[in-house]
Amino acid sequence: MKKMLFVVAAVFLLAGCPSMLPQQPPAPVEPVTPTEPTEPPKPIEPPIEVVPTPPKITSINWNAAIQPLIREMSVTDDLATGKLLVVDNVKNNSGGNIQAVNATNTIIDSVNSISALQTVPYAQMMSARKALGLSGEDSLGLRSAAIGLARYLQADYILFSTVDGKKDNRVISMQLMSVASGEILWSGRHKVE
């Protein structure tokens, strides 16, 4: 009997539950009448930032400063014809932008055209710097690193160049050093204009 009572109670309970949810009437659709297009609001523009102007790069006539020094160096008595020369990157101690790469390239071109020495080719120089763990752009600040690089390249001489002074009074200094002895064979200075 308990089973029967339980079945009847379950039937009444289930019969009382609605099987479908009550439906709501659909929302009324209102027709939209076209209106004249209005001008959209203009976006607010951010304030204009003033970009600072970069420092002016002054054009330096490197040939005028370097060629007289290379001519002076080429008549040094201790230089042997056809020997190999490592040209170190020009070191900038002037505090300004002097385009040291252009100066280095001018030195290499001047040595190749004026002097009886031969410069180490650029590709060979870069591969040697990479093999020794030196950066390609850096000047070889330590003489020992420069001499090590020159010995690795089997060069006979190394030429160091430095630009000192302020904007209106810059001077380029060069020193030619023997790789074998470490002796400074020649040094010279010239005003950079």
UniProtKB/Swiss-Prot annotation:
Pfam families in UniProt: LpoB
UniProt keyword annotations, A-Z: Cell outer membrane, Cell shape, Lipoprotein, Membrane, Palmitate, Peptidoglycan synthesis, Signal
Subunit structure: Interacts with PBP1b.
InterPro entries according to UniProt: LpoB (IPR014094)
Membrane topology note: Lipid-anchor
S-diacylglycerol cysteine lipid sites: 17
Subcellular location: Cell outer membrane
Alphabetized HAMAP family for the sequence: LpoB
Lipidation (N-palmitoyl cysteine): 17
One of the protein's GO biological processes: regulation of cell shape
Residue span of region Disordered: 23-50
Function: Regulator of peptidoglycan synthesis that is essential for the function of penicillin-binding protein 1B (PBP1b).
Pro residues bias (residue ranges): 37-46
An example Gene Ontology CC term for this record: periplasmic side of cell outer membrane
Family note: Belongs to the LpoB family.
Name under which the protein is recorded: Penicillin-binding protein activator LpoB
Signal peptide extent: 1-16
Any GO MF annotation of the entry: enzyme regulator activity
Main location: membrane
Transmembrane segments: none
Origin species: Proteus mirabilis (strain HI4320)
Keyword Signal attributed: yes
Coiled coil: none
